[in-house]
Amino acid sequence: MSRIKKKFGNLLGLDKYFWSSRPNGLYSVNFHRIGDSADTQFDPCVYSCSTKELEQHLTFFKKHFRIISLSALSEYLRTNEKINERVMCITFDDGYIDNYSNALPILKSLNVTASFFIATGLIGNTVVPWWDKVAYLLKTYDPKAIKLSGWSEKVINQHDGDHFIRAVLASIKHCKRTAEEQIKELEAYLNHSG
């Protein structure tokens, strides 16, 4: 229904009225990944939009807001100057390579400033962020292939994400207990053989 309202509003020109009537002040927009979410083996929900959509968004923002840097915002805050227009800060989180390869060229071509928050702990190593690890496991692992030793006639169905995650967490706890038991056995063996 909201899609129909939006199209109807666009036909009547209400979208232009809506944005031109927004109050003065600071607006902030945050993006994560830019590209085609269908092409990733990791978390598709981290994608904010495609490159085409980013270009459309930025063009729209330029039309309705004065886009400022975080440094300019800092100056507003330092001087306690009142914001008498619609200003916007644009940020990108986590520092995925597509921010550089996809977003930056569009930002440059439209002469739009933005700030990038880089997850510095991921630079120079092959660490995959936890949310991408979880998404990768969920996309590539067959729930029916989980071996549940000691459980008879148990079937895992992907009724909803919560049930599957609880089953995985239970499996992790079981593995932890098993590892702790094996470490105790190894310690006992080493103490008796030494």
Regions found by a protein language model. Give the residues of each.
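Membrane-proximal basic amphipathic "stem/tether" segments
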Residues: 1-30, 38
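C-terminal domain-boundary segment and adjacent tail
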Residues: 46-82
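Acidic/histidine-rich helix-loop elements
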Residues: 35-49
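Conserved, mostly hydrophobic/aromatic
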Residues: 29, 61, 93, 107, ...
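Short, solvent-exposed loop/turn segments at secondary-structure junctions
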Residues: 32-36, 73-75, 95-97, 121-124
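Membrane-embedded segments
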Residues: 87, 91-106, 110
